[in-house]
Every structure is written in structure tokens, then in C-alpha cells.
Curated annotation (Swiss-Prot):
Gene3D superfamilies: Enolpyruvate transferase domain (3.65.10.10). Phosphoenolpyruvate binds at residues 22-23. It comes from the Bacteria. HAMAP family: MurA (MF_00111). This is UDP-N-acetylglucosamine 1-carboxyvinyltransferase. It comes from Psychrobacter arcticus (strain DSM 17307 / VKM B-2377 / 273-4).
Amino acid sequence: MDQFLITGSSRIAGEVTISGAKNAALPLLAAMILAETPTTLHNVPSLQDVRTLIELIGGMGIKIQKQGDTVTCDTKSIDNFYAPYDLVKTMRASILVLGPLLARFGEAEVSLPGGCAIGSRPVDQHLKAFEAMGASITVENGYVIAQAPKGGKLLGCKFSFDMVTVGGTENVIMAAALAKGTTVLGNCALEPEVVDLANMLVAMGAKISGIGTAIMTIEGVERLHGCEYAVVPDRIETGSYLAGALMTGGDVLTKNTSALLLTPVLEKFEDMGAIITSGDDWIRAQMKGRPKAVDIRTQPHPGFPTDMQAQVMAIACLADGTSTFIENIFENRYMHVPELNRLGASIQVDGHTAVVKGVECFTAAPVMATDLRASMSLVMAAAAAEGESLIDRIYHIDRGYEHVEKKLRALGVNIERINSND
């Protein structure tokens, strides 16, 4: 199992090009199932989760061509509607093939998903919506078995999600695009990745209004065609590298990104003392001195994203003062706290609240990555620490950060990937 060896006391500075967003690429790849003609997707990040989903849809008989960051899918040869546990177990987003399969082919059998263990994150909202559209849903031996109503077409309906769910919103708008009649969805997620998916569906011939709002109306069409589309930049990768500048008194320029995707995070960075400048496709963070303490409350978009909570907490560990974090999205997303404390942080957790008392510096220690975003917070903390830190279970970071060592080295981080079996 690979590990990172990081020699700290780095000043994180330089330029880094941001990849396409993993959380956008996955639903866009799933949406390709809906198209009767080939679809080409650009700016696709080379990540384990992406490779897994490509393998998953390829196993259905879909012809896939990949060249660089471009993926083309032709669904003419699809011959099964099955998503096996062996692939689904590692990645939660695999449930997103359920809606497209059910909508286009009238049936699907998809294993219940895996992914980061940061909360229950149930798929019941997906299933309730499909049932409201007339589908028959059963769960047997860990598999969701779905069947469209008589005639093979889902039926448009009015449905409001009980809670804001990004995956649920994505799954249902894909299904509704080919449903018979009109679907009105309430309490939709507003995340940029949801907007990106809706825009691609429109490019494929879908009729969707209310994109980017809590109420979307989807008028079902008979068929969807392929298109050429580019994945939106990864706002979380952007924020993660900018966070490194704040932790180390650095200066980081992120390219191929957009400040419009990251407004609540950039505002907090400015509150912490950073100088933030931006243009159409770049953001720069400059930092001098210790960060200032802040209070963070995670919320669905357009609030502060839970996927940046761990990285900003790592900055707060070095802040002048006490910061308070309230995690409102997932009930188990403080697993990085014991690891940051091993590096010399002073954090106490009580339920959904974490109180962070700033310290002068981190000190090197062996730590263990617990989930995707926590792993990046530990990498940045280790880069700021004095001495050598060994980070275990870095397969988490490979799921969400493309070419991470190359990009970190370009920013001045002394990082080496080692195999613990060597």
C-alpha cells in the first residue's frame, strides 16, 4: 500500500493547473448512457473513481475511446443493464447509472454503492423519486432492482426531495429527461456540478428549465443525442491548493478554474488574512503572517462546502486565535481531527462542533488518511510541519486529486510516494 513521505517546512508557492471536477465528470459519464449517438467529453480527470466508472459502463457493452483527457462513448452496443458489486463497492457515484438505465432501457440492476465512510448518505431519496415516476423498486442481496412501468417508460411527476441531495438530484433529472410527460422537482441541489450536468443534458436535447434553482422542470423527450462537452473545473481541488498558501505564508496561482465556483471559500480565505485576486480563468492567493481565526458552518451550495471543511480546519490549526467549525452535511466528517492533533494541533470535537485553538506550528508525525478530503488536509499540514511525516492510506487522495505529487512538487512541496511493501 502506497504512502507519502513529506519533508515539511515548505513554503507552498507557484502555479498549478486545475483538472476537471471529479464530482462533475462522474454524473456526466453516467449521462452518456442516455444518448443514442456518440458523446465526447473533454477535461476528464485521470482519477481512480473516473476509471472505475468508465470500466463499469464499458462492462455494459458501451464502446469507449479515451485519449488524454477526452472520453468518447458509443452506446449502440450496450447489451446489459447490470452494475456489479465488485466495481460499485469502491465508489458511491456508481448509483448514478441507475437513472439513465431505467429511463432509456426500462430496467436496471445496480449494487448498493460504497465510497468514503463519512456518513450514511442513504440512496432512499433516489429510489423514492423513481417510485413516484412509476418504477417498481426492490432491494435484494445488496442490489437495487428497478423496472419501469408497463410500456417501459418512466412517467413524469411532481416530487420534492426530503433533503438536499446532490446525487439524488442528478440521478432523477437524468431519468426525467426521457420520461413520458413533465417532471417538476423540488428542493433540488444547487451545486455547480448539478448545473453542469443539466447543461450537458440540454446539449443532448433535453428540455430543462430552472437550472441552478431549487425547482427544476424537465419535459421528457423521446430520445437524446450525443454532444461534445467539457467538464467544469474542480472547485475543491482549486480550494485545496490555495489553502496551502494560507498555511505556509505562500503564494499560489491556480489556472483553468473560476472564482465564481468558489465564492464562499474565497470569502473565508480573505477573512483569514489572504489576498485573493482572480480573473476569468485563474485565482491567486497570497499570504503573509499567521492566518486569522474564523468560524465555519458547512451548508449546501451556495453555502460553505463540506468538501473544504478539512482543508480550512488545517489552516485554522495555525491561526492566531480560536476557530469554531459546525458540520451540517455529514455526521461523521471529523475523522481527520485525531490525525491533525497528532501533528500538534489542538482540536476538540463535541457532536457536530469542532473547536480549534491555533498553535504556532505543526510537528511531523506518522498519520493516516481517513477519507478523500481529509487526506489533502493532512498533506498540506505535513508540508507545513517541521520534519518528516509519513501519510498512510493515500489511496483516498488518488480518488480525487489528479497528478497530485507532480502538482505539489511544482508548488515547492518535498513529497515522495513510497510503497510500504518495499
